[in-house]
Amino acid sequence: VTETNTNTIPVPADGFIPGPVLLLGAPGVGKGTQAQILMDLWGIPQISTGDIIRENIKQGTPVGREFQDLVAQGIFVPDDLVNRMVQGRLSKPDVGRGYILDGYPRTLGQAEWLDEQLDGPGFPGADGDMTAAGRLPVIAVSIEVRYDELLRRITGRRTGSVSKKIYNIYTHPPLVEGLDDVDGTPLVQRPDDTEEVFAERMKQFAELTAPVIEHYRGLGRFEVVDGEKSVETVTASIATALERLRHRTA
């Protein structure tokens, strides 16, 4: 994750309630970096479907077991099951001021279901009902980067085999080609950091995400920011867009 000085980032006025935030963007645009910065700035959690699924499987919950069974059989996991997992997570008290959605909603059906829930009484659970802030409408921001730049970010990525330090042969190369600055061991490329794998991931992203984007665009709850600027500039652009969208939905 890229380090940044959050003190230099202009953010919405004190008391700003972000509510539910959906960050969209293709693989490599920096969603993870930006999500972490916004979490630190506003003290809100990230709601990751990957984390929720792993936790349900670990705890052996009914939905966790159902998910495992479907995956083992090679059956597509239906929206209803994913929605139930998210519903359980959104019943926790830490979502009161808002949260960042990661990997959800991924389909139009999931987006429509979430909107229906947030427009209703919230998600009653063991910890009580979701607060009014947590039930604000979802607002979505897409971080956009040109395809050729994303390709450079992904295919140029190399990692120290021991230190795990991350490089990019185009933008942040090691001092000696192919060797880790830390210990001189060979750098490695992840098997999925190839042009062929990236092209397939981009195809899947476009097919899944396009309907979700159009859903929120149609509701007037969607904006785009340029992801090719500095980390700080992108964060400031996202914060400004979120404040504008939140005022629009107030």
What positions do the PLM features span?
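Glycine-rich phosphate-binding loop of ATP-dependent small-molecule kinases
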Residues: 1-250
